[in-house]
């Protein structure tokens, strides 16, 4: 016979009693109660209807929640400008401008600059000359007003310490610079006004590597002359990416004459939204145009060595339109995992509806106490009694 300490049984009984008092050993089972409460019933059906409409109408159909998506396509952009223009200015005489002259850079990238106006300072050589009076701190009365070696943010060169005559009305500090300094006025009308009729060809290829799918915005045709005669139209020629510059600026909300005079920047956005469940038949580029800013210019120079052996340059201050091309896109295709996630989310929302209706019924309704007592019932097994003999 095995003996146990007297306190062991008492400790086990106390532990079991504690577990019972905490409800740890209680078993709960659901009890369904049919309640005739119109307010809660109507609220439940309306919420369920809202969830179903949201899941089916918005999440599944509108947002295509049944599709796996690729939001990071690989893109390639090639641009070509076509057109010629003639300018008549004293410094350059009659000059013909073609693509190599008015497009910067000439490689045809997604950011390029179209020259529409310019200011030329020809035959500059390095030496001493008076600063332009419009430059801050350039005007002077004596040599003391021109500290030697001083230069400013807007200065064309370094001061030599001399105050010299600029013209009949101004005296300015002499500088070491490319001389003569730039001093002309911007033409009142754009010198390359014909740029309005230039054409821009934009070839864009987009690749969705997740689905191994590629598409180009240019029509695949055996007719080599097609792109020489067509112009883009969203209805009749959606795959002819040839744009007239004047039309493009107008679609961006700008005026070509204003932008051509002092320059500006235009954004071109190409967006692809491809549904690959239809084999990409509706995968067409969507174009939009934005006027980003007014006023844009920069300077460039052509250098050569004169017959006298002196380095010489012609300085050009170019005004024009900067084009920025941005390509975005997304593609989707049916997949089981996103479909299951969307449907599962809807089922979770339906469960939340039941939870909210329970809160209304048990805590908010005027008969909440009655429904509480009806829904939650404590059941205990009957105690059995043994007759002692």
From Swiss-Prot:
Phenotype upon gene inactivation: P2rx6 null mice exhibit an apparent normal physiological behavior, weight, food or water intake. No significant changes in serum concentrations or urinary excretion are observed for Na(+), K(+), Ca(2+) and Mg(2+) in these mice.
Disulphide bond pairs: 129-179, 140-163, 146-173, 230-240, 274-283
Extracellular face residues: 67-335
InterPro entries referenced in this protein's UniProt entry, alphabetically: P2X6_purnocptor, P2X_extracellular_dom_sf, P2X_purnocptor, P2X_RECEPTOR_CS
GO molecular function, one term: purinergic nucleotide receptor activity
Described function: Acts as a modulatory subunit rather than a functional channel. Unlike other P2XRs members, P2RX6 does not seem to form functional homotrimers. P2RX6 requires the presence of P2RX4 or P2RX2 to form functional heterotrimeric receptors at the plasma membrane. P2RX6 can be translocated to the nucleus, where it interacts with the splicing factor (SF3A1), to reduce the incidence of mRNA splicing. May function as a nuclear regulator of post-transcriptional modifications in neurons.
Subunit structure of this chain's protein: Unlike most P2RXs, P2RX6 does not seem to form homotrimers. P2RX6 are likely to form as obligate heteromers with other P2RXs subunits. Forms heterotrimer with P2RX2 with a variable subunit stoichiometry determined by subunit expression levels. Forms heterotrimer with P2RX4; functional differences between homomeric P2RX4 and P2RX4/6 heterotrimer are minor. Forms a P2RX2/P2RX4/P2RX6 heterotrimer. Interacts with SF3A1; resulting in a reduction of the splicing activity.
Protein name: P2X purinoceptor 6
Species this chain originates from: Mus musculus (Mouse)
Lineage: Eukaryota, Metazoa, Chordata, Craniata, Vertebrata
């Amino acid at each position: 016979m095995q003996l146990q300490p007297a306190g062991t049984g008492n400790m086990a009984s106390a532990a079991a009693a504690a577990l019972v008092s905490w409800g740890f050993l209680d078993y709960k089972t659901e009890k369904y109660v049919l309640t005739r409460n119109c307010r809660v019933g109507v609220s439940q059906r309306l919420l369920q209807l809202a969830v179903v409409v949201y899941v089916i109408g918005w999440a599944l159909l509108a947002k295509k929640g049944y599709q796996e998506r690729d939001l990071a396509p690989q893109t390639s952009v090639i641009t070509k400008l076509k057109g010629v223009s003639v300018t008549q200015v004293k410094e350059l005489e009659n000059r013909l401008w073609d693509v190599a002259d008015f497009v910067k850079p000439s490689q045809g990238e997604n950011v390029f600059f179209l020259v529409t106006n310019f200011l030329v300072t020809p035959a500059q050589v390095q030496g001493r000359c008076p600063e332009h009076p419009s430059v801050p701190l350039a005007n002077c009365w004596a040599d003391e007003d021109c500290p030697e070696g001083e230069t400013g943010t807007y200065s064309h060169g370094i001061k030599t310490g001399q105050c010299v005559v600029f013209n009949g009305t101004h005296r300015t500090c002499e500088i070491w610079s490319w001389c003569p300094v730039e001093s002309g006025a911007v033409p009142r009308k754009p010198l390359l006004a014909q740029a309005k009729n230039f054409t821009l060809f934009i070839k864009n290829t987009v690749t969705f590597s997740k689905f191994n799918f590629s598409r180009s915005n240019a029509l695949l045709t055996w007719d080599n002359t097609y792109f020489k005669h067509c112009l883009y139209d969203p209805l009749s020629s959606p795959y002819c990416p040839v744009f007239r510059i004047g039309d493009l600026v107008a679609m961006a909300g700008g005026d070509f004459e204003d932008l051509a005079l002092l320059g500006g920047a235009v954004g071109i956005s190409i967006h692809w939204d491809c549904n690959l469940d239809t084999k990409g038949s509706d995968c067409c580029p969507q174009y939009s145009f934005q006027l980003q800013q007014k006023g844009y210019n920069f300077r460039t120079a052509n250098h050569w060595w004169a017959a006298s052996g002196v380095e010489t340059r012609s300085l050009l201050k170019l005004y024009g339109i900067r084009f920025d091309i941005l390509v975005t896109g997304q593609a989707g295709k049916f997949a089981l995992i996103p479909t299951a996630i969307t449907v599962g989310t809807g089922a979770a929302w339906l469960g939340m509806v039941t939870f909210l209706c329970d809160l209304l019924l048990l805590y908010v309704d005027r008969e909440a106490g009655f429904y509480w007592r009806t829904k939650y019932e404590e059941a205990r097994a009957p105690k059995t009694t043994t007759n002692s003999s």
